[in-house]
Amino acid sequence: MAWTDPDTAHKPTTGNVIPTSWGTMVNQNLLHLRNSPETAAAARYTLQTINNATITALSFTTELWDNANMWRSPNPTRFRAPVDGRYLFAASVSFQAHYGGLRTVWLRDSRSGGSFGIHRQDATSSDSTSICCSGIVGLLADDYVEVYVAQTSGETLGVNWARAALIRLGG
């Protein structure tokens, strides 16, 4: 059962009596919160070099959380779906400061080989360029998603840090 707002069943300000179903609803809400969906997040806090005009998969180095064995360090670029379903995948990437070119972040799934999220923007001249990208994708068990980046500064640049999370939304 999905979350139910208790205020829709009982409004203390109106003097309505608590319905008998309220106890069941609260119990189901607590079970929903306790049995959270499959989710994982990882980060990279060290520099990863990105060559000019080269699409590169980001490699994550630190697990932030993982309740379903979705991110595995032997494959540090991949977030794996443990069961079939719809998933939200989100990433945030910070490129080193440089005055020129574009910075791009793609979200790619292994089943189709295509991207389901993309964000491009011009570099900022005086500060690092940070990009957030997210998308919803249908995955089968053991499919995986990755974050890819590219930059066109004319030089080799680094990614200062990156974070990504995969969350199962439902079946």
Residue ranges: model-predicted function:
Residues 2-171:
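Extracellular jelly-roll beta-sandwich "head" domains, especially the C-terminal globular C1q domain
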